[in-house]
Amino acid sequence: MKKIGVLFGMENTFPPALVEKINGMKVDGVKAEFVKLGGVKMADPSGYAVIIDRISQDIPFYRAYLKNAALSGTIVVNNPFWWTADDKFFNYALATKLGVAIPPTVILPHNKHPEGTTDQSMRNLMYPLNWEEVFEYVGFPAFLKPYSGGGWKHVYKVDSPEEFFHQYNQTGDLCMTLQHGVEFEEYYRCYVIGQEKVHIMKYDPKAPFHERYVKGNPPPSSAKLKERIEKDALTLCRALGYDLNTVEFAVEDGVPYAIDFMNPAPDAEITSVGQANFDWVVDAVAKMAVNKALSGENPAEELRWAGFLRGPVEVPAAKAAAKKRVRA
């Protein structure tokens, strides 16, 4: 029996709907259920072919469990190793290298020393910072936002250096980015599932939270724009290796700028995304999970330490060093 586990937190609608959908597909040899955990023994197999992770970003115990599960061949959506290492600033840089449009963005030193550090810990920092250069590169309006995290927490729109410093001085020890504010005519949030399926949703980030998904979901203003959004969304998720993600685009002068695309546990509650979007994402994730469960994939084989699990191996660098010592 191939088991698909769903690991979740405060969500009320998506997890049970996903389990019900998978089991309702009646695929021979496949069953979905909620993951139940106690103390986890090291190197113990999880018993799951696939785990859909909706909460480990908030619970370190769950993240450690998922890494242990991946070690034994469980396919975890999304990859807990990359998710742990990822951040939004790196994503912006990577996207730029991939040809995806990104507004000018700068990462900034912490406004206050992180806990356990002093000014002596910061001796590699320029002081004072060349703020004029930063503002000239980014421009105004701009958004000051954390280099990691989500949910629109600690995000501030600033229209001048004075507004910037007012908000920056309240960010404490958070690591922040400053990104040029796109004056968008259209805005879209896209579900990207299995690095293959894209569902474009008209979105209004300025509206109250429960009204942000535009009713009727009108399509992008042109076929060319729709094609570009789909292409860039897939490019980003394939490069990042995310099988369940949302990508947000702000469209200015016909150019879709990728604004936010590190959402490996994206909102999928029916009360916020609406019935049609909810039905689409439940169906797409269910089919992806079943396909992965039946695929025979072993993600552990792609990781750096996988070779060591197959038996004694020599690291190339160590091998070369040994030969050099012999010659000496």
What are these regions (language model features)?
Residues S56-Q57, M262-F278:
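Glycine-rich phosphate/pyrophosphate-binding beta-alpha loops
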Residues D44-Y48, D253-A258:
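A short, glycine/Asx- and small/polar-enriched loop/turn
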Residues K2-F8, A70-G73, F81-Y187, G216-A223, ...:
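Active-site nucleotide/adenylate-binding loops and adjacent lid/helix of ATP-dependent enzymes
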Residues G9-S121:
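Conserved N-proximal alpha/beta basic substrate-recognition cap immediately N-terminal to
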Residues I51, V77, F143, T246, ...:
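Generic enzyme active-site microenvironment
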Residues F209-Y257, D283-E297, E301-K319, K323-R327:
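A long amphipathic alpha-helix within ATP-dependent nucleotide-binding catalytic cores
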Residues G172-C175, G181-K215, E230-T246, A250-Y257, ...:
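Phosphate-binding core of ATP-grasp and ATP-grasp-like enzymes
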Residues E11-N12, Q57-D58, W83, G149-G150, ...:
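Short, solvent-exposed loop/turn segments at secondary-structure junctions
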